[in-house]
Amino acid sequence: MDISNPSEEHTMLREMVRDWTQEFVEPQALEYDREEKFNLPLLREMGEMGLLGISAPEQYGGAGLDATACAIVHEELSASDPGFALAYLAHSMLFVNNLAINGTEEQKKRILPLVCSGEWIGAMAMSEPDVGTDVLGLSTTAVQQDDGTWKINGRKMWITNGCLDE
């Protein structure tokens, strides 16, 4: 894609997201930033617009759009509220896109519709004290137990979007 000559679909997406961002994201940005709050209902509204699963296949509730479309949404959100844009990025790319590419078929069918709609919010626990975000150096392990639950051993510095969902 020639970024200086976007497709009609990309142009329409940019206009839609820019208009929505200016009307709904920008007016709340300063207040939410100063009060260290997050506008979860606003993020969920993006699910109704088809943006939370922008790169996920349509069969799982996503929009099935390309990387350029993802970049357009991130760019437009970042212009008004970088913190909100980061939460969107963590949800849509670190969680949804990762699951769409690497998840099992069962996981995709069970989880993707919920995160694409905004009913669930995706998170990512990657950073560790000894290696930062070097994914090849991560030491945390997850082992499924006999009862079907998972035992997780390791240390994380934070979980991006971990405190957003109810």
Residue spans for each PLM region:
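Glycine-rich flavin
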Residues: 19, 25-166
